[in-house]
A protein has these predicted regions:
Chain B
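Transmembrane alpha-helices and adjacent helix-loop boundaries
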Residues: 2-282
Length: 248, 282
């Protein structure tokens, strides 16, 4: 079976700084892929290349069999099929929670206001946030804001979801509520790519783990292979550092 | 058991009360001394009686008020029109300057030249060039009324200022907001309309209102083109009586006109400050 999302020979540099070097990854439908690696290993750039927020220097990206990295592609319509959630939530501060969630469905998917709001309220209810529909983002806790940001991405009915360090700005209690939501999305069959420092969570939720080192895919495998039997010295060093920091 | 403040706390509160009483007394005494000093200097000046007679004459003030107030109605009409077009044109220029598409390069270039030019030219010069130069062209369909041309000159100058304020607001919106909107699939123009502009305009409302206050008073400058506004009406009165009090009347009316907007601006700024503090930002 062809993978839902496929990166082949991706290369990206900023000036003379080569950030991603010949990266090739397959993301099967309904799988959860976790990307780990030290700061500066290229995780965020990889995520930003995947939703075309960065221009590629070389290589190809296929979504559902079609080349979305082709020159002259309708970038807006590609992005509408990919849900992205960022470390800093990036909710729109001038819009209520409900309006944050319905903005893209109304403008991009052209849903009627009532349809979009019904859908949004259903999602909010499912994830225990229905009483926050009319609140503005600044009145929510960090964990609530990030859950709203994830719901906002899911509401556009994306083919898959990119989660870039979505818990890095949260304290442990709030991290738990966000991770619970992500686990629920996985159980519903959402295809996800997650860049994270939460190794415990990565072990539990990942179907496959990718260790990025100096812009290259250094090691891939199941969580058991990556965390219990690391092959390369670099991965052992990385896991050792996490262990010392109490993150593993 | 009910709470009883400790004797230490009672002492502290008493000391605080004493200090605040002392501050009030000092402020009163200082204001009184300062006021007396100014009064003595002015009333003691050699030409005081003459100035008082030619600038603060109650008789002429009453006489001038109706025609000056009537002139102010013209200022009001001018500034309502001018404010509308200033905001509209300023917004369009600001948007033009923040576009990135190569097709729109000429538009960006024109907008840049426009703001550079009209922010640099003294308003009085623009008024004279537009008000006297355009009628000189003798193009039949262009109105040559001083009021219309004066308004055009005000709009030209002030839209350049307002455009820069709005552009600063647009560029002040965090780039991650734009990124989040684009990641959701919104187009460039949808992002501008629904995400960037609402935040930008909210952030620049106080400086924007400040420019409008300035526009209100500068609407008096159209009198140089011969429009009978408040200042021109005061001038006519002065020419008849050789007394300058009508100018003071016009000045007082302009101040009264701007005070509501100034207070509104202050109030809005305070409100925004406190809202941001409530959000725990900065």
């Amino acid at each position: 079976m062809k993978p839902l999302f496929q990166i082949s020979n991706l290369r990206k540099s900023f000036g003379t700084n080569l950030v991603l070097d010949d990266v090739s990854i397959d993301f099967p439908a309904q799988s959860t892929t976790v990307i780990i690696g030290a700061s500066g290993s290229g995780k965020s750039t990889l995520m930003r290349c995947m939703n075309l927020l960065e221009e590629l220097d070389d290589g190809q990206i296929h979504l559902d069999g079609s080349d979305i990295s082709a020159y002259g592609i309708e970038i807006d319509s590609v992005r509408a099929q990919i849900g992205s959630v960022f470390q800093a939530f990036n909710l729109f501060p001038h819009l209520s929670v409900l309006d944050n969630i319905t903005l893209a469905p109304r403008l991009v998917q052209k849903l009627k206001k009532e349809t979009a709001e019904k859908l949004a309220l259903e999602l909010l209810k499912r994830f225990g946030l229905e009483d926050k529909a009319d609140a503005f983002p600044n009145l929510l806790s960090g964990g609530q804001q990030q859950r709203v940001a994830i719901i906002r991405a899911v509401a556009t009915n994306p083919k898959f979801l990119l989660l870039d360090e979505v818990t890095s700005a949260l304290d442990p209690v709030l991290i738990a509520e966000v991770l619970t939501l992500i686990a629920e999305l996985k159980s519903e069959g959402m295809t996800m790519v997650i860049a994270t420092h939460e190794m415990g969570f990565a072990k539990k939720i990942a179907d496959s783990v990718i260790f990025l080192h100096h812009g290259r895919v250094h090691e891939t495998g199941t969580p058991a292979q990556i965390f219990e039997a690391p092959q390369s010295q670099e991965l052992r060093d990385f896991l050792g550092a996490l262990h010392q920091a109490g993150r593993l | 058991m009910t709470y009883q403040p400790s004797s230490l706390q009672l002492q502290r509160e008493a000391a605080k009360r004493r200090a605040s009483r002392r501050s009030t007394l000092i402020a009163l005494a200082s204001t009184f001394a300062f006021g007396t000093l100014i009064a003595v200097v002015i009333t003691g000046a050699q030409g005081y009686e003459k100035v008082k007679a030619s600038f603060f004459n109650w008789h002429y003030a009453k006489q001038a008020l109706p025609s000056v107030a009537h002139g102010l109605l013209l200022n009001l009409r001018v500034l309502v029109m001018a404010e509308f077009f200033v905001l509209l044109l300023g917004l369009l220029i600001a948007i033009a300057r923040t576009t990135t598409s190569p097709v729109l390069y000429p538009l960006r270039l024109i907008a840049t030249i426009y703001t550079d030019l009209f922010r640099g030219l003294p308003l009085l010069l623009v008024l004279l060039l537009v008000g006297l130069g355009i009628p000189g062209l003798r193009i039949s369909w262009i109105p040559n009324s001083a009021v219309v041309l004066g308004t055009v000159a005000l709009v030209l100058t002030y839209s350049a200022y307002v455009a820069e304020v709005i552009r600063a607001g647009i560029e002040g919106v965090n780039p991650t907001q734009r990124q989040a909107a684009r990641a959701l699939g919104l187009s460039q123009s949808q992002t501008l309309e629904h995400v960037v502009l609402p935040q930008a305009l909210r952030n620049v409302t106080p400086p924007l209102l400040n420019d409008l206050v300035s526009l209100q008073k500068d609407s008096g400058l159209i009198s140089v083109l011969g429009a009978v506004d408040a200042i021109r009406a005061a001038g006519i009165q002065t020419a008849q009586s050789f007394n300058f009090t009508p100018y003071l009347v016009a000045g007082a009316l302009f101040v009264l006109l701007t005070i509501p907007l100034t207070r509104f601006t202050d109030w809005l700024t305070r409100k925004q400050d406190s809202r941001q503090r409530a959000q725990g930002q900065w």
